[in-house]
Regions:
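Catalytic glycan-binding domains that act on GlcNAc-containing polysaccharides
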Residues: 46-213
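N-terminal secretory targeting signals
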Residues: 1-75, 208-213
Length: 213
């Protein structure tokens, strides 16, 4: 009888010990999980901060590169990058257009009345300005910031209009939308929108991008 009692007590103690071990294991696992999650959160946060810092430094490099390339004011170069981010377009395409149009000269004026960095004409500049809620002033087309805003807005509009077909957008920027249609109708290469203008802009854009990277 005593033997059975001792065995029962021993069995109970073994069971209690087993559950205590499980509980300790669960507690340890929970602590390990908490520590792991904490470390992961730190890594995630540090990674996010690193990405932000890296992105910021990259943008600063691009602004400085644009400043050296164009000789435009630093603030104007920063404005170009910010407007490209807002409009979700490649800044090197914009730089290619400005190079082709005015050779980065804010005071450039074409024989047909084109003005400023993007060589905008009134029939393009006026509706773009009015759509932006700006008062149209032809003399302000020589103002770098005003001209850049209109130029980048127009480029972004055309890229969206032609479903990201850069040659169509660039040829339309140069010739107008009707001019693009007429050009493509006369094209011998399957109604291609590739023009000397679009090819030159793309050449500049690719060169600038390659030199930057």
């Amino acid at each position: 009888m005593k033997r059975e009692k001792y065995l029962s007590i021993l069995l109970v103690m073994c069971i209690l010990s087993y559950f205590m071990m499980i509980n300790m294991s669960i507690t340890a696992d929970a602590e390990d999980l908490a520590n792991y999650q904490a470390k992961t959160e730190v890594l995630r946060r540090d990674g996010f901060i690193y990405d932000l810092l890296n992105s910021y430094l990259k943008e600063k490099e691009l602004i400085e590169y644009t400043h050296r390339l164009t000789n435009l004011d630093y603030d104007d170069c920063e404005f170009i990058l910010n407007e490209c981010k807002i409009n979700n377009i490649d800044p090197f395409i914009v730089l290619g257009v400005i190079k082709r149009e005015s050779d980065f000269n804010p005071n450039a004026q074409g024989a047909a009345g084109e003005r400023g960095l993007g060589q905008l004409m009134e029939n393009t500049a006026r509706p773009v300005a009015e759509n932006l809620g700006y008062v149209y002033d032809p003399d302000k087309l020589f103002d770098s910031r005003y001209n850049l805003k209109l130029t980048i807005t127009q480029i972004a509009y055309l890229i969206n209009l032609y479903d990201n077909d850069l040659h169509m957008a660039l040829t339309a920027y140069n010739r107008g939308q009707q001019g693009l249609i007429e050009y493509m109708e006369k094209s011998e290469n399957n109604s291609s929108a590739v023009s000397d203008y679009s090819a030159k802009v793309m050449q500049f854009a690719n060169e600038y991008k390659e030199n930057f990277h």
